[in-house]
């Protein structure tokens, strides 16, 4: 196993250990449903917005505006492609109302924040992280607009007519807008404010993973298996989406570094924030938990294989 592959594998193991801690806390009755919901709201309203804005203010160097805009647009193309594929697949699977939104979320949104950044660093070095941060901006915006719509419409058992503007006007969305404006204006490397936000944002990853593990503690082992729709969604997240993006984006992206980072970020397992959104909107939490568990486990193999195939 080479250094890059070992670094990727190590990040996956770290993720599982934290999820396992949350699982153990639930089994030991150290966490409750009220705790899970409260911690989820804290992450979505406070620590995640702090992490997003802090990622820009802590940067010592930003690419030029042209590069920022180009990288941002490439990432938007990737997400537009994944959203279109998810809509088609859930229609072909005849996913029922009340569940189709969660399946769409699982197909489109990967765990970019926790796994994506360390994996990118392990493969291309820390200098590549600024591009990963730029690619993460569309993720944060779309995850809490389109992704929130997917899950909220599931919970309400209706279409988009039941989802109001408040679904999209959240602290996370506002922080994404602030981060994009700061990056375009070239405002960065603000030590005091950046450090404060970074310290607060550092709570996001362990807190989110503890919620995932605690929620898994509500499921019996036999309930983790899932059905055919779940497995199709997992395969789409780990295999179909990165391969499709590799083929399509290679037609418009000339820089192999940018292309590689884009493809690898689309190969991450299901985003753990899906669990918190389901908690917030009282949606189908068990399905997204199963998807998070299985895609994280299987990504121990799929991500290293993808990196090797891409060369």
Predicted segments, located by residue:
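Alpha-helical transmembrane segments of multi-pass small-molecule/ion transporters
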Residues: 1-311
């Amino acid at each position: 196993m080479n250094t890059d592959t070992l670094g990727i594998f190590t990040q996956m193991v770290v993720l599982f250990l934290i999820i396992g801690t949350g699982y153990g806390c639930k089994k030991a009755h150290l966490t409750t449903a009220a705790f899970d919901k409260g911690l989820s709201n804290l992450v979505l309203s406070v620590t995640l917005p702090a992490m997003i804005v802090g990622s820009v203010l802590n940067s010592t160097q930003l690419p030029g505006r042209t590069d920022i805009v180009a990288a941002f647009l490439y990432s938007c193309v990737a997400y537009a492609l994944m959203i279109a594929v998810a809509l088609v697949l859930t229609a072909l699977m005849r996913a029922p109302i009340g569940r189709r939104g969660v399946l769409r979320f699982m197909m489109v949104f990967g765990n970019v924040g926790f796994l994506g950044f360390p994996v990118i660093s392990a493969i291309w070095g820390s200098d590549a992280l600024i591009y990963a941060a730029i690619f993460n901006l569309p993720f944060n915006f779309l995850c809490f607009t389109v992704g929130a719509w997917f899950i909220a419409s599931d919970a309400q058992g209706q279409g988009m007519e039941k989802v109001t503007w408040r679904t999209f006007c959240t602290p996370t969305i506002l922080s994404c807008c602030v981060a994009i404006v700061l990056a375009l204006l070239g405002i960065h490397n603000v030590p005091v404010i950046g450090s404060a936000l970074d310290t607060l944002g550092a709570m996001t990853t362990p807190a989110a993973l503890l919620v995932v593990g605690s929620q898994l503690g509500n499921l019996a082992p036999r309930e983790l298996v899932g059905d055919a729709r779940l497995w199709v969604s997992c395969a789409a997240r780990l295999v179909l989406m990165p391969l499709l993006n590799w083929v399509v984006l290679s037609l418009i992206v000339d820089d192999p570094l940018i292309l590689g980072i884009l493809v690898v970020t689309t190969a991450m397992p299901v985003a753990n924030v899906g669990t918190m959104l389901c908690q917030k909107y009282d949606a189908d939490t068990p399905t997204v938990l199963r998807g998070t568990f299985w895609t994280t486990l299987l990504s121990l193999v799929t991500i290293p294989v993808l990196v090797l195939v891409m060369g």
